[in-house]
Amino acid sequence: MNRSPVIGITTDYKEKENTYSKYPWFALRRHYSDCLYKFGCTPIVLPITETIENIDFLDGLLISGGDFDIDPKYYGENTQSDKIQTIKDRTKFEFKILEKYFPLNRPILGICGGCQLLNVFFGGSLIQDIESFI
């Protein structure tokens, strides 16, 4: 029996009060898992953790998007705009998981902020505030 591909998906993370919960929470937009199911994959939600022990079982990695910015320190810049909103724990986790997963030579997809993270991970930079740039 063939096993369906197992795809790990990173989650969004919020600590703010007066949102969904007064406690920190993870979120994943449903369309990520719906699309993977549609194409015969088994999605696995990857909550943000301090350590990353076992990701060898993943056949692919999807770095999801979110409503935040990559901390400019990751691409060698200081914060130049008060519009920058980072989620330090999430970005740190996603960099750690990429460091462990990339050497496995398996598929990685970044969507929206995930694509930006991949760009920075591989040495690229970002425009911090497009409105002031143009």
What would you call each of these model-derived segments?
Residues 113-115, 122:
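Active-site loop->helix "elbow" adjoining a glycine-rich segment at hydrolase catalytic centers
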Residues 1-109, 120-121, 127, 131-134:
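N-terminal beta1-alpha1 cap of cysteine-dependent amidohydrolase-like domains
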